Amino acid sequence: MSHAGPSARDVAAFTSLSVAARKPRATSVRRSFLLWTAVEQKKQRSYASERPYEAHLLEAERALARGDALLIAAQADIEKDLKRTFPSLQGYGMLSEGATRNVLIAHAQRNPAVGYCQSLNYVCAALLMVPLSEEDAFFSLCTVVEDLMPPDYYTRENDILGARVDQLVYSTLLGSRLPRLAGHLLDLGCPISLFSIQWFMCLFAKDLPLALTLRVWDVFFVYGDHALFAVGLVMMQMGEARVLSCRTLEE
């Protein structure tokens, strides 16, 4: 592999995303064609082969009433994380806690192997702030977990094997593309996954402004998790000088 850092095309693409995200239309009338296509495809398959969103939500409510242990555990984790999800936006009408709760518990019912995994709260909340309806946010979340990300990326037991594999790949890529930066982080005793696993599992929704997150997702919905590596490398390149100036892990 080359040691020249992210390609000029990667940098130009990320810069274009940043510029486009500053345009007024980026949040208020955001309707990504790629996102809607993925949602509609998932809805069509789901309606043809299983129950719609409302049925999953109703079944989740019934399962909770029956005392389903797995779903009760998922509900408890969801409630803890809801208070931590975009706290600065709560109370401003930009984030519906009830809608986020509904979508996450319906997804946990639909996919018990995943149930609820921390980080899905940020993905779900960002989808609802596009804004999407609960139904479309639900099918978008299903698309992310079931179609776009590798197996075992989000798991109920939090072993998240797929995510850990991606972190090993990302660490290798960073060492190849930005060896000085990777070496400096190693000298500081800072594992790259300390921050990058959050980037990948939250699809950057926790760390980037919503408008820019959605632009990243345009690429993600085409290339899947490969897009996350490109964005992650460019972000590290953009912050390289600042990181290299740090002399301690605390900095």
Which ranges hold each PLM region?
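Helix-rich, well-folded core regions that mediate interactions or catalysis
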Residues: 1-251
